[in-house]
Amino acid sequence: GSDAEALVMKKATGLEDIWWIELDMSAGEYEYEYLLLNGTRLPDPLSRRVINGKTRVVIGSGGGSTADDYQWQSNEYIRPALDTLIIYELHVDDFAAQGSGQGHFNDVIARLDHLQAAGINAIELMPVTEFPGGRSWGYNNQILSAVESSYGTPAEFKELIDTAHEKGIAIIMDMVWNHMVSSSPLWQIQPDMNLNPYFKNSSDLNPNEVEGTWGMLDVDHFNPYTVDYIHRVHRIWVDEYRVDGFRFDATRFVGWDMNQPELGLLGWTSLLHDYDPSLYITIEHLAADPWLVMNSDITAGWHDSFHDRLLDHVHGNYSSAMTFMSQVVGLHEYSNWDDPYDYPTQVIKYMVSHDEQSLIQEMVQWAGLTIDQAREKDKFYATILFTSRGTPMIWQGQELGFQSGWLDDNGNGNWDEE
């Protein structure tokens, strides 16, 4: 509506920065946005669904506000045991789309039988939270509580999770808390670094934080407002969408401090673990840090050395037998003498990921092998992946021996390569 039609919110008495409004609304579907004094219009920073820049909600017969009225079917589902996980990382668009089309949650549902037949019991989704525009890998995150509208509706995402659960497949969400784009309503609602509690200058480093935001805004994880906001978002995904866990991106750039365990990475991972100890809480913390995983509520970290030593082997840079046994077969990171991970379930090991192209491509490009030779040798590396200690993860299309790391000329999955 027009500015003149806007409803004025009230400031809570005795509470800092709390504004509220109470409305008598009948059951139905609604859209709303915030109108700031400077004329800026914003969706809710805790939106579940955003359509054309506005928050969309459903008011139920009991007065509750949700993104939809989805009815769950997989109520008997039990999460796979941690030591049985075989994780499959995929990007909704690239995995499901063909040609010049765009992939959606429904397209992923159509391929769940393929994943189940391949022995997959956990899917790690690259970011599916709201980002600017219609095509992205999702690491330019905008609203981490909202489903990316180009992939489908909240109800369709719930159907994906529900259907996966009926097949015994867990869903792990990739979440990006290190940074946000400047169009995020969490920033736009107070675009002043000195006044907005959720952000800081990227050069103002917190304990154990490395600078790196890829040109986006740096989230301040040592502010209790931030920790509270992150936990509220996590609870949305756990409570309303029934996700089984999270993979947290770029946590080396977040910061942590054992003397301040309620803040930083330790703060919101411990809140999540305390809320539901059965959740998978995994981190991409590179360079990897076994000590951090072993002394926190984090379930597991990406095992960087596993990939690196296999890549060395592909390039003909052969490691010593001790290095291979320590860092590939064993649970060491980067060194044969440091303290390794305590348990195999504390590492996520992989040959390929969204950041690392396929070893088949490496063998063709760097070792001069034919595609058939590379695929045959790739089976040797896959044997190591599935027989060494740790939780194996494969990248979309890897099970079919795709050379290209999945992408065709349109950036989509090329199932014809199968």
Sequence positions of predicted segments:
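Hydrophobic faces of well-ordered beta-strands that scaffold small-molecule active sites
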Residues: 86-90, 123-125, 171-173, 246, ...
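The feature marks proteins involved in alpha-glucan
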Residues: 8, 14-89, 94-100, 107
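Substrate-binding/active-site clefts of carbohydrate-active enzymes
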Residues: 51-54, 73-82, 91-242, 251-276, ...
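Active-site rim elements
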Residues: 20-21, 75, 95, 251-256, ...
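Core domains of carbohydrate- and sulfate-ester-processing enzymes
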Residues: 32, 36-75, 167, 185-212, ...
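Beta-strand-rich binding/interaction modules
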Residues: 1-5
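Short, solvent-exposed loop/turn and secondary-structure capping segments
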Residues: 35, 43-46, 98-102, 127, ...
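Conserved alpha/beta catalytic core and glycan-binding cleft of carbohydrate-active enzymes
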Residues: 54-59, 242, 258, 262-407
